[in-house]
């Protein structure tokens, strides 16, 4: 067992390893990184990207060589769990302290941010966060600012100050309450003043926000943080047990037994409905916490209030959209309710913006919700990609925990006097209170959501890629052209589902493609082209994972190898036509069911062949099947337009890495064309011989590679070909006999 810092806890595990910390003792920044990673590893301690950590220590000034005090603090946008030493901003502490004399008051606090880069130590250029002065002005060497649900439950309670006094008495603590104040220079001075006014205090609860803790050493700071959070968890949970009340007023409905089936049926409609400004990716949460909230009596009221902690609503928006519905009403009624609620939600959001926007406010953003709560089903989150959608949903579940904690702390007589979150008594009416849970005033929420500093952060985000926000299913993605398509789409920002009859091959493809993307932006799926049910299940899995489908690509087919003896190919006719033609029709039909209710422009790309137009003998089943594909593409384009574009490519002799060219087919072709080879040559060597032979028969004299076909498919699948449908692009190096007419 590792040696750990002392500090008994009930819920949280003390992960501090004295031996590991001792090895980092000479590097204070490395030790700060270690502390930060431990804190960020547990979402009960702080949410993704939330909170920040800091240390103050001496470093030699790069100009004078003399030791100077510096502040190391988590840089803007960093996440504690994954922080590296390079993610911390380093600043001269004396320069930060000198800024107090430059401060012109709360109305001008945003201008102070421009001074932070001027305080940077040496060549450190990590962007300092808005919370930098909050750490700088506290007279402690090591400070943690965290957003644990248990602490925010206290911070968001109408009786929060009273309950904090009770907490301090119970645990022998001296934690101070501060009312709500937007993060910034003013709050930094309030923190400084609170510590000065309360000598010996060991933490601060920020109303409607979070928690500050500290220590004289890195280990003491860490232990103080987890001990405080753990005690707050015990305090909140004890109140919940003693209250005898049902969480959120009890259940109004039960979780739907078939919730995944209903979610799969409604998600494409819902995704399309909330993508009117820009396309989004979904995350579906049907955890116990999500269902308990969604199914509760109080969910409509609490949803309307919105979240409290600023970190929460920056992703969850001002409030989630609650859709009243019961399972026995059916999916059609749910669609109607979603449509009705969306109209109201957008109107309310525009009114919210109009009420508080000033001449210098950023422009109105997307008025669609990023979180949707549906009784019986759970919580749906939406964002630009899967990771952000998951985090958005996690943040709302954090908010659910906060609401549960705050309502559990409700006393029998309610809160007495002005709400403690209000810094000034005259503003207390701006805060809303429901069963002890206090939400931020809309005006304060607007000052966060449309803060010029937050807008600047959004503007610094990297440009989106060609297929960002798109979901692509690649059938036949386990090998050859399909594999290259999956890799290319992943590299260009798509969410990729690699579907193949050979699941191991599909998983291998995704394992490679994810290196061009991220772990959460794709998956492998089993798909049998001879089974409609298998196709439907693969598409259903895609919906539950990402929310819908935008692009369907099929590169899979079979080629019945001609028998050298000249035996009839008749036994292969039915199988070839089933897999190469009928399966494409069925795949398109199954996809169309989704695309029609999703109501977003979509694309289907099928794979034909030069053989479709070149008459010859020996491969009739394959050639005829590809001729049928050409016309199927045209028929589908007419039938599914204008919403869905349908196109295809017609490759020829793509030998490299192709499952269509197994060793026996390659040998058969080499024998057919009289190309010499040795029996002991590798399959790849034989393929290379055949590919070069084919290349010399084309106009361009260049072999056709899977990447060449993938590039054509990606063009047809993407917006650059938005006005092209019913078309087949040859990718054959120039075969005159295969010119399309």
Regions found by a protein language model. Give the residues of each.
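Substrate-binding pocket helix/loop in short-chain dehydrogenase/reductase
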Residues: 563-575, 694
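Residue(s) in the substrate-gating loop at a strand-loop-helix junction
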Residues: 609
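Canonical Rossmann dinucleotide-binding motif of NAD(H)/NADP(H)-dependent dehydrogenases/reductases
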Residues: 466-497
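Short, small/polar-rich loop/turn modules that mediate ligand/substrate recognition or access, typified
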Residues: 641-645, 724-726
